[in-house]
Regions:
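Eukaryotic low-complexity, charged/proline-rich intrinsically disordered regions
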Residues: 175-181
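Catalytic alpha-helical scaffold of carbohydrate-active enzymes acting on polysaccharides/glycoconjugates
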Residues: 1-168, 183-202, 209-232
Length: 232
């Protein structure tokens, strides 16, 4: 049994300082070029380097504004990570499929994993459709011959659902950031114990983890002590 690492790549330029936060908003709502010298996906690069040193694999979920640069793609290939769609415009199957095709064209890879940007409480950007409707996403993923859906619930004890042709749906995750986790019920030690008995999804956002040294230390500990897994 193992840790299934899910990384949601939400912000192209992070959220601090203020200038990079503004570039992230501009990229999300309108357009801004991918400029490495401005720190494009800088936090993701750090996380991937940490993972690759440990031979730990992960799922990386990209938005239309966080498409991987050449440098990030090299780290992805080196670590054999999997690319997924972090769905924004979930109004219809057609809008979902457009985002899937966008990421596949950009990366040159078949995308087999799906997650949803936001949990239904707020709208995050011009292209974002806020309602959270996991049953629809699971149906779309199956129709598109994808392999796995990762949901946004916050109770990591909820078990995954398996379907036809090996499709898997994980309704919930262990959110590394404590704002989305009941830390009294699910401390990091719970995850260390549980992931030795069953597969558990660990969800994180690079800019949030690296912003707080204690989260970065917890992440490093988890990757060092637990095996990681990509679903075949």
């Amino acid at each position: 049994m193992a840790l299934i690492i899910r990384i949601d790549v939400d912000r192209p330029y992070g959220k601090s300082p203020v200038g990079r936060h503004l570039l992230s908003r501009l990229s999300s709502d309108l357009w801004f070029p991918r400029i490495n010298s401005f720190g494009y996906l800088k936090e993701l690069q750090v996380i991937l380097e940490m993972l690759n040193k440990r031979n730990a694999r992960s799922y990386l979920f990209f938005r239309r504004c966080t498409l991987p640069s050449e440098r990030i793609m090299q780290l992805i290939d080196d670590g054999q990570h999997q690319i997924g769609v972090h769905l924004e415009n979930s109004r219809s199957f057609e809008t979902f499929f457009q985002e899937k095709q966008l990421i596949e064209r950009h990366t040159g890879k078949t995308v087999l994993a799906l997650s949803k940007h936001g949990s239904g409480t707020a709208r995050y950007g011009y292209h974002h459709y806020a309602p959270y409707e996991p049953d629809r996403y699971i149906d779309w993923a199956r129709r598109s011959r994808m392999k796995v859906f990762f949901g946004n619930l916050e109770d990591p004890s909820i078990r995954p659902n398996s379907g036809v042709n090996g499709f898997m749906a994980f309704p919930s995750a262990f959110w590394l950031e404590p704002d989305w986790r009941d830390t009294s019920l699910f401390p990091v030690d719970w995850l260390l114990s549980e992931a030795r008995k069953s597969d558990v999804v660990l969800l994180l956002h690079p800019e949030n983890v690296l912003e707080k040294p204690e989260l970065a230390e917890e992440f490093a500990r988890l990757v060092a002590e637990l095996p990681t897994k990509i679903l075949s």
